[in-house]
């Protein structure tokens, strides 16, 4: 093992959708350093994602690939992960005829690129075979080029990174077939016909087969063409087909823990938690002054100390400088510190900038308005009454996937009280950023 983890249609199926049109660019998470110019080493690469399942094990009416995670279909996250890899030339998704229009709508809404659709088959292997046919240059009406290497990946494994994709592709380039594996979590047992233990497998000697897998295109395409109806109907392992029909022993590549497959309802919750964690790694503190002694910069320092695992940066809300646009590309959490009377205008300015970007389309964006005043000078009830506009503005913003709420910070002349309020504000902000709870939209929270 390397360290580092379908069906013959009765009639030929046609590629029913060409390349997706131009769409919004994705602000991607940083890619792993898997190699500077991998394309020069691996030739042309395409991917096939079978997405024709019905989600039977999940026990829901909506196929799991179309279930929403943070208001976005799960398959969209997987497509985004594949699209970020610039050396994957084409991505073929196989979906059932009844879900074809829904899939086209997802591609259009979220700006996915390099995506083509093919009709899914009745089984996993039949769906994969249809996807391969769309790349084989033997189907009329298709614009796709026959690749040298093809990746097969599940539409419900959204956290695949470029590093593991490159490692399985390079291994497939050398050996003809390769696949990611992971250690077994539970011991596998074989029951007898009467329901008693027959034998168990040594967990240390066996591995779980995962995705992605990669193949010389000619190898896996030939394997599917030779495949028996029984294998097409009941088989699940692509590596086994390459071994059985083309005598290619796959290279096994140790995968990462995030290759798991969304299978059950609780997996949707786990996927949501992982996505929230990823998009909460950076906070941008928007201030209205460059004065390093301002309460905004003091809050930034407290946030940095309290949330040492999160990157905290600051900028002045000034569209002419272009600074805020630089943060828009990489941040999904904005803390606006207002100490002047123009809070509403400044907030609308930020929301306008966000609306012009693609950020809220892809993930929920958190905006926290921090209002600083001395609680002993301005009565709290009076201040909250003056900020009632936040509730209405938050309702508007929520429709655009922006979660807006407010924090009241005691800008006391007493340094100890000010520090206590700064620390409490940081704790509230951390919870709002990490949880992204829409139930708190429009709320004013007192620190």
From Swiss-Prot:
The EC designation for this entry is 2.7.7.40
Q: Which residues form a coiled coil?
A: none
Q: Where in the cell is it found?
A: Cytoplasm, Cytosol
A biological process (GO) of this protein is: isoprenoid biosynthetic process
Q: Which reaction does it catalyse?
A: D-ribitol 5-phosphate + CTP + H(+) = CDP-L-ribitol + diphosphate; D-ribose 5-phosphate + CTP + H(+) = CDP-D-ribose + diphosphate; D-ribulose 5-phosphate + CTP + H(+) = CDP-D-ribulose + diphosphate
Q: Which CDD domains match?
A: CDP-ME_synthetase (cd02516)
Q: Which UniProt keywords apply?
A: Cytoplasm, Nucleotidyltransferase, Transferase
Give GO cellular component annotations, separated by semicolons.
cytosol
The record's PROSITE patterns line, in alphabetical order, gives: ISPD
Q: Where is this site: Transition state stabilizer?
A: 57, 64
Annotated site residues (Positions substrate for the nucleophilic attack) in this chain: 203, 261
Q: What is its main location?
A: cytoplasm
Could you cite one Gene Ontology molecular function of this protein? cytidylyltransferase activity
Q: In which pathway does it act?
A: Protein modification; protein glycosylation
Task: Give, as one word, the top-level EC class.
Answer: transferase
Function noted in UniProt: Cytidylyltransferase required for protein O-linked mannosylation. Catalyzes the formation of CDP-ribitol nucleotide sugar from D-ribitol 5-phosphate. CDP-ribitol is a substrate of FKTN during the biosynthesis of the phosphorylated O-mannosyl trisaccharide (N-acetylgalactosamine-beta-3-N-acetylglucosamine-beta-4-(phosphate-6-)mannose), a carbohydrate structure present in alpha-dystroglycan (DAG1), which is required for binding laminin G-like domain-containing extracellular proteins with high affinity.
> Record's family?
Belongs to the IspD/TarI cytidylyltransferase family. IspD subfamily.
Q: What is this protein called?
A: D-ribitol-5-phosphate cytidylyltransferase
Origin organism is Rattus norvegicus
* Lineage per the UniProt record: Eukaryota, Metazoa, Chordata, Craniata, Vertebrata
Q: Which gene encodes it?
A: Crppa
């Amino acid at each position: 093992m390397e360290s580092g983890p379908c069906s013959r249609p009765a009639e030929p199926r046609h590629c029913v959708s060409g390349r997706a049109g131009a769409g919004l660019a994705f602000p991607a998470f940083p890619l792993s350093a898997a190699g500077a110019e991998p394309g020069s080493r691996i030739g042309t690469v395409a991917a096939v994602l079978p997405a024709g399942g019905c989600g039977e094990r999940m026990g829901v009416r909506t196929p799991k690939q179309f279930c929403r995670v943070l208001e976005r279909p799960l398959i969209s996250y997987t497509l985004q992960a594949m699209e970020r890899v610039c050396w994957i030339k084409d991505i073929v998704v196989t979906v059932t005829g009844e879900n074809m229009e829904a899939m086209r709508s997802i591609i259009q809404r979220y700006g996915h690129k390099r995506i083509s659709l093919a009709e899914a088959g009745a089984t996993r292997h039949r769906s994969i075979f249809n996807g391969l046919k769309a790349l084989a240059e033997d189907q009329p009406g298709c614009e796709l080029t026959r690749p040298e290497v093809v990746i097969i990946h599940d539409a419900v494994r959204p956290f695949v990174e470029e590093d593991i994709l490159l490692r399985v592709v390079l291994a497939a380039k050398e050996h003809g077939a390769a696949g990611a594996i992971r250690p077994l979590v539970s011991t596998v047992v074989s029951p007898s016909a009467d329901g008693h233990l027959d034998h168990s497998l040594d967990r240390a000697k066996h591995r779980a087969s995962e995705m992605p897998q990669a193949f010389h295109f000619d190898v896996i395409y030939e394997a599917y063409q030779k495949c028996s109806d029984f294998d097409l109907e009941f088989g699940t392992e692509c590596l086994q087909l390459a071994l059985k029909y083309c005598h290619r022993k796959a290279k096994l590549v140790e995968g990462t823990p995030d290759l798991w497959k969304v299978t059950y309802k609780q997996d949707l919750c786990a996927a949501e938690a992982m996505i929230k964690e990823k998009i909460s790694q950076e906070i941008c503190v928007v201030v209205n002054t460059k004065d390093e002694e301002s309460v905004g910069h003091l809050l930034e320092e407290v946030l940095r100390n309290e949330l040492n695992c999160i990157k905290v940066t600051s900028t002045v809300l000034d569209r002419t400088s272009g600074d805020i646009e630089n943060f828009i590309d990489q941040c999904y959490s904005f803390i606006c510190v207002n100490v002047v009377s123009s809070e509403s205008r400044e907030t609308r300015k930020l929301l306008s900038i966000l609306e012009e970007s693609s950020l809220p389309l892809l993930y929920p964006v958190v905006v926290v308005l921090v209002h600083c005043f001395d609680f002993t000078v301005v009565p709290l009830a009076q201040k909250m009454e003056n900020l009632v506009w936040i509730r209405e503005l938050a309702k508007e913003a929520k429709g655009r996937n922006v979660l807006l709420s407010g924090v009241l910070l005691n800008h006391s002349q007493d340094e100890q009280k000010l520090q206590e309020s700064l620390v409490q504000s940081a704790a509230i902000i951390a919870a709002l950023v990490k949880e992204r709870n829409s139930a708190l939209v429009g709320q004013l929270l007192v620190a």
